[in-house]
Amino acid sequence: MTKIKWLGAFALVFVMLLGGCSLPGLGGASDDTIKIGAQSMTESEIVANMIAQLIEHDTDLNTALVKNLGSNYVQHQAMLGGDIDISATRYSGTDLTSTLGKEAEKDPKKALNIVQNEFQKRFSYKWFDSYGFDNTYAFTVTKKFAEKEHINTVSDLKKNASQYKLGVDNAWLKRKGDGYKGFVSTYGFEFGTTYPMQIGLVYDAVKNGKMDAVLAYSTDGRIKAYDLKILKDDKRFFPPYDCSPVIPEKVLKEHPELEGVINKLIGQIDTETMQELNYEVDGKLKEPSVVAKEFLEKHHYFD
């Protein structure tokens, strides 16, 4: 895929912070080059590469990848400014509460319908159906611990919660809505001790027995690699974060072939698969472009 180019997102962020202007030469879909935005997350870069490679295989279009978009807000502003033509990964729960300013919706189908309708109405953007994975917070334990304590759901933690050590990312304890305070209100119990830490440290902490349970990201590859167990959120406390691509209707009108290409990925990547792909990058240190290509080849997208 020699036509795929990487564009430095730091310049994009700098320009937007100064005045919301588009970068020179990056405004909209021009010269048959489609600019695909990837957030600064492993799975976003993997999926962005899948989209780019499929577009270049199936069409006569070129692609450029704009990576390291540091937040959902930065990604959204980049699309509003015409600096990217495709958002590779947008999450229903995030855009529902942040971009749209609406109350969290716990039903995945309803949440998806709301963001699809509102993005069409407010921005003339097409929010596609989900790839098939949901990257949400998930209470996670070792399988050995789950068997010993007879735990399968979050509610099962309640019996001995006062004895458990919980590792969480730094921000969650103070988050409004789906943070610790809301959790206690919904589930009716507190943990004996909570330990805030960087999200990347929670997996080793629970694997090595430093923590009894941790709050993880459901698509992180270490969940599968470390043979951890995600507990069912039986009271549906966390809102859904189903992942989808988003494209302005203007771009689809200029390049109608894009919709068919994108639809090839819809519903084809479940949470377990995304865990595996993420681990190929984070655990085995493969490049996202290589992992994307291997997935597409394995599933006969290039045949």
UniProtKB/Swiss-Prot annotation:
InterPro entries: ABC_Gly_betaine_transp_sub-bd. The keyword NADP does not apply. It is a lipid-anchor. It comes from the Bacteria. Pfam families: OpuAC. Residues 1-20 form the signal peptide. A lipid is attached at C21 (S-diacylglycerol cysteine). Induction: Repressed by OpcR. GO terms for molecular function: transmembrane transporter activity. One of its GO terms (cellular component) is ATP-binding cassette (ABC) transporter complex. One of its GO terms (biological process) is amino acid transport. Member of a high affinity multicomponent binding-protein-dependent transport system for glycine betaine, carnitine, and choline. Belongs to the OsmX family. PANTHER family: ALIPHATIC SULFONATES-BINDING PROTEIN-RELATED, CHOLINE-BINDING PROTEIN. This is Glycine betaine/carnitine/choline-binding protein OpuCC. It comes from Bacillus subtilis (strain 168). The gene is opuCC.
